[in-house]
UniProtKB/Swiss-Prot annotation:
It is an enzyme of class 1 (oxidoreductase). It holds the Pfam family Amino_oxidase. InterPro entries: Amino_oxidase (IPR002937), FAD/NAD-bd_sf (IPR036188), SQase_HpnE (IPR017830), Zeta_carotene_desat/Oxidored (IPR050464). One of its GO terms (molecular function) is oxidoreductase activity. Belongs to the HpnE family. This is Hydroxysqualene dehydroxylase. Involved in the biosynthesis of the hopanoid precursor squalene (SQ) from farnesyl diphosphate (FPP). Catalyzes the third (last) step, the reduction of hydroxysqualene (HSQ) to SQ. The lineage of its organism: Bacteria, Pseudomonadati, Pseudomonadota, Alphaproteobacteria, Hyphomicrobiales. Its EC number is 1.17.8.1. It catalyses: squalene + FAD + H2O + H(+) = hydroxysqualene + FADH2.
Length: 417
């Protein structure tokens, strides 16, 4: 008789684990505490703009193979769209200067040898000085590893590392930053084409996974919050949802794919990150100008990245805790001013919405990175998943999928023994 796998949490980590286990033919049961699957990667209808918007502008790169394989498995890889080449346009709104970093289409970072493809006013030596980050340890600081000043840092390195680490780059883990650089910039343009979910995060990465699982007979229960894990002889024996208790057989497996605070509550003594950082996203109902760049890096203002979608302009601001206590009406006017300057547009403030993910990611410092647990727990049949676990990457969608796949592999190994 086939074993069962119970997955707690229907975010990207939980869904990726569920899809992989379903592909292997195992009965899968998914339980989600909220009313919507997707976790921090979801879409919703917003009445203020009268549009369906994402909670965040999650950017995928063509080299994120785990995300792309996951999308392929649920039949939506074509929904991840972007330019055919790895070209990143930027604007400095403090100087009105515009440029484009052209990473080419190969597997090597040969673009650094071509002046026209580099950041303006930078030399080859500036890029070579970044090399130490490639072999830096996770306990080292970015600020002690590479120069955190100068033109290259301000115009390229800082925007990329700020988006990846979601903390002030000099304070971030050089090891985590190095992992990002190795898998993107060092891998050449072939790995760096930016991709976004064309029809929204839920439509591309969440709902198709749920439908696939349900077609295969899996159960996906929403509004089903786990209250307690019961143990017997160092294995999980029962899932306590309050009014509903589910027995876990001796040959079953459980994957805990919930946020770190919930995991620590369910597993007393579990070490998890304790410091988090916010990401602020703003959405405007506004038709982008014809020929607008789908993704534009912005330097010299509050806005960091500007995304152009049909009927909508959207921005992302990382490490956004400094904005949380400022009235939204004040913040949105500063953001809209930056959008107009960066996008070359004008007009009164259109219908808008601001989405603040207060605990968007763990703080990617060496100290917090050291608190990330691996997937194995003290219970033989219980495994952890989540972008906050020890994936070797900062908190990203790629890390989420990797952690889910890793937990699924361990569950498969356990149920096959």
């Amino acid at each position: 008789m086939p074993k069962n796998v119970h997955i707690i949490g229907a975010g990207i980590s939980g869904l990726s684990a569920a899809v992989q286990l379903s592909n292997a033919g195992l009965p899968v049961h998914v339980y989600e505490a909220t009313q919507q699957a997707g976790g921090r990667c979801r879409s919703f209808f917003d009445s203020a703009t009268n549009l369906t918007i994402d909670n965040g502008n999650h950017l995928v790169l063509s080299g994120n193979q785990y995300v792309r394989n996951y999308a392929r498995a649920i039949g939506t890889e074509s929904g991840l769209v972007g330019p055919t080449s790895a070209k990143f346009p930027f604007v400095d709104i403090s100087t009105v200067q515009r440029w484009q970093v052209d990473l080419g289409g190969g597997r090597l970072p040969t673009w650094v040898f071509h002046k026209a493809r580099r950041v303006p006013d930078t030399r080859l030596w500036d890029y070579l000085k970044l090399a130490p980050i490639l072999w830096a340890g996770a306990d080292e600081l970015v600020g002690n590893t590479i120069p955190c000043n100068g033109t290259l840092y301000r115009r390229l390195v800082r925007p990329l590392l700020l988006a990846a680490l979601n903390c002030d780059p000099p304070e971030g883990s050089a090891g985590l930053a190095g992992a990002i650089v190795r898998e993107t910039l060092l891998a050449g343009g072939e790995a760096c084409r930016p991709l976004v979910a064309r029809d929204g995060l839920s439509a591309v990465l969440v709902e198709p996974a749920v439908k696939l699982l349900e077609r295969r007979g899996a159960t996906v229960r929403l509004s089903h919050k786990l209250r307690k894990l019961a143990k017997s002889a160092e294995i999980i024996s029962e899932l306590d949802f309050g009014d509903d208790k589910i027995a876990v057989g001796p040959d079953d497996a459980v994957i805990l794919a919930v946020p770190p605070r919930a995991a620590a509550t369910l597993l007393p003594g579990l070490k998890t990150p304790t410091e988090f950082r916010a990401v602020v996203n703003a959405h405007f109902r506004f038709d982008p100008p014809v020929g607008a760049d789908p993704i534009l890096g912005v330097v010299g203002g509050l806005v960091e990245w500007l995304f152009a979608y049909p009927q909508r302009l959207s921005v992302t601001i990382s490490n956004g805790d400094r904005l949380l206590d400022i009235p939204r009406e004040e913040v949105v006017r500063v953001i809209w001013r930056d959008v107009c300057e960066a996008g070359g547009i004008s007009g009164e403030l259109p219908p808008w919405q601001i989405v603040c993910e207060r605990r968007a990611t763990f703080q990617a410092t060496p100290e917090q990175n050291a608190l990330r647990p691996g997937p194995v727990t003290g219970c033989k049949n219980l495994f952890l998943a989540g972008d906050w676990t020890a994936t070797g990457l900062p908190a990203t969608i790629e890390g989420s999928v990797r952690s889910g796949n890793r937990a699924a592999d361990l569950a498969l190994s356990e149920t096959n023994t």
